[in-house]
């Protein structure tokens, strides 16, 4: 006989599925608002930012319109309270937005982070 206590079914880990894109099941722990912000940031980064970043590296330019677009979408100042013009979202939401922009370009993610945290 084993001296180890048996796990109750509710305490046993779910070994039935593994999602390599979300190994820690972060998505299950997010609020609806956090998921919406993440998805909006991902769509912007993939659909609007990525092609312009490729062109910017090739042509050695920066497109100032990107900063305005990110601001209009609320991607700058995610955690700043609404009464000051931000979204008033959580730091988890900020991290999710930063991760989606980082997937496309580290430079724009850095710019976004600086402008988002300047109020601290």
Language-model regions, residue ranges each:
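Intrinsic disorder at enzyme termini
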Residues: 1-33
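A common structural microfeature
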Residues: 27, 46, 53, 67, ...
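Mature N-terminal segment immediately following signal peptide/propeptide cleavage
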Residues: 28-48
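Conserved active-site and cofactor/substrate-binding residues in soluble primary-metabolism enzymes
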Residues: 36, 61, 65, 92, ...
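Structural signal for hydrophobic packing residues in well-ordered secondary-structure cores
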Residues: 41, 45-53, 101-108
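Short secondary-structure junction/hinge motifs that connect adjacent elements
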Residues: 51-72
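Internal helix-loop-helix
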Residues: 72-118
């Amino acid at each position: 006989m084993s001296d180890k206590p048996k796990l109750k079914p509710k305490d046993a880990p779910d070994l039935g599925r593994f999602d390599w894109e979300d190994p820690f099941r972060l998505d299950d722990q997010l609020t609806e608002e956090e998921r919406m912000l993440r998805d909006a940031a991902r769509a912007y980064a993939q659909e609007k930012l990525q092609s312009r970043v490729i062109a910017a590296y090739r042509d050695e330019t920066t497109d100032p319109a990107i900063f305005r677009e990110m601001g209009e979408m609320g991607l700058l100042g995610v955690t700043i309270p609404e009464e000051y013009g931000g979204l008033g979202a959580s730091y988890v939401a900020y991290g999710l937005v930063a991760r989606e922009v980082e997937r496309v370009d580290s430079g724009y993610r850095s710019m976004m982070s600086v402008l988002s945290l300047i109020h601290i």
